[in-house]
């Protein structure tokens, strides 16, 4: 059971990270393997159906858990608590959590992306910050290789293969 000081510290961490969610990122970034959602929105935003209703994938995605995976204040607070409680597992926690919450930053760093702190991808000065904050973005999903694990339990938790060809596959 938590002592009052632990609850107080957790609450302060939660509020701190909640206040950082407004950090603006550059959604038009490019990395070795990925491109930010801002580059996709030029063509895939503002699409309407015959009735004039917006059917843009960009609008749906931008409000989704995928788009906000690295911005979620609860997730940030949970990571901070887990890293504090299990400092000896920091490398494993960082890798496992960024596989799903900041997959482009995880992939570009070969699974070595730190989440918090001076060297963390959530720090706006980090070179992979924009990729991390873009969450599970367009070019991440659209470069997933179609292999036997896709759509099975073996393919869950970020256990996917990414195409190095930078070809964006559709429909998924």
Language-model segments: which ranges?
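Intrinsically disordered, low-complexity segments
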Residues: 8-9, 17, 65
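Hydrophobic h-region of N-terminal signal peptides that target proteins for export
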Residues: 15-24
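Sequence context of c-type cytochrome heme-c attachment sites
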Residues: 24-134, 146-172
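Bacterial N-terminal signal peptides that target proteins for export
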Residues: 2-11
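Subunit-assembly interface segments of extracellular/virion macromolecular structures
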Residues: 135-142
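N-terminal hydrophobic alpha-helix used for membrane targeting or insertion
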Residues: 12-14, 56
């Amino acid at each position: 059971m938590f002592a009052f000081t632990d609850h107080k510290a957790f609450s302060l961490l939660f509020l701190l990270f909640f206040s950082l969610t407004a950090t603006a990122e550059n959604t038009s970034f490019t990395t070795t393997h990925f491109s930010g959602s801002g580059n996709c929105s030029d063509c895939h935003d503002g699409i309407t159906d015959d009735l004039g209703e917006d059917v843009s994938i960009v609008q749906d995605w931008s409000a989704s858990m995928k788009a906000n995976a690295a911005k979620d204040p609860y997730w940030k607070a949970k990571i901070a608590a887990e890293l504090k409680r299990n400092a000896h597992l920091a490398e494993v926690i960082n890798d496992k959590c960024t596989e799903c919450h900041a997959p482009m930053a995880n992939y570009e760093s070969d699974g070595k992306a730190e989440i918090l702190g001076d060297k963390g991808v959530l720090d706006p000065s980090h070179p992979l910050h924009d990729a991390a904050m873009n969450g599970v973005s367009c070019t991440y999903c659209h470069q997933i290789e179609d292999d036997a694990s896709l759509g099975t339990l073996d393919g869950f938790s970020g256990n996917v293969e990414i195409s190095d060809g930078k070809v964006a596959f559709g429909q998924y």
